[in-house]
Amino acid sequence: MKKQLLSALIGASLLAPMAASAADYVIDREGAHASITFKVSHLGYSYVVGRFNDFSGDFSYDAAKPTAAKVNVTVNTLSVDSNHAERDKHIRSADFLNTSKFAQATFTSTTVEDKGNGDLVINGNLTLNGVTKPLAINAHAVGEGQDPWGGYRAGFTGTTTFAMKDFGIKMDLGPASSHVELDLVVEGVRK
């Protein structure tokens, strides 16, 4: 009996640190389970909507301690796609993303605030067009669990808005078109 109790205690003590630590995930972009879309007002009458087709990233997350989460994302800005070839060419130009000089945008989290019920604020630094500025993403933990293929997944949504001029984008599209709204869908596969 003592031997069984000792074995159980040793086993529990070995598993306890694993249960309390954050898991690392890679963003499942290839399975089309993640997206980065944007929306910009078009003259105050409508919206131009687009996406970035090529990005990668990873995150660590523990539902028991969400404030310890970390996020890193790299976006290939050349992959911008607004479903209009001429407009995409203009977005890639020095008027906007200047992709010939800055082919990548990055986001690296610095802190995470737990707002309760799966709601988070992910604070970090966005580097876009060669400029790095703080950015807060309002996020929500959608869920996590086993997938049918023997893996483990965690999913989140997020939104944020930023002023183009803050990132050195000086093209004046009028006051109704000065901000970009980002919508994020992230599903990660545990490493």
From Swiss-Prot:
Keywords annotated in UniProt: Periplasm, Signal
Main subcellular localisation: periplasm
GO CC terms, sorted: periplasmic space
Signal peptide start-end: 1-22
Tagged with keyword ATP-binding: no
Transmembrane stretches, start-end: none
Top-level taxon in the UniProt lineage: Bacteria
Gene3D superfamilies: Lipid/polyisoprenoid-binding, YceI-like
Location within or outside the cell: Periplasm
Coiled coil: none
Pfam families in UniProt: YceI (PF04264)
Family stated for the protein in its record: Belongs to the UPF0312 family. Type 1 subfamily.
NCBIfam families (alphabetical): PRK03757.1
Protein name (database record): UPF0312 protein Shew185_3055
Native species: Shewanella baltica (strain OS185)
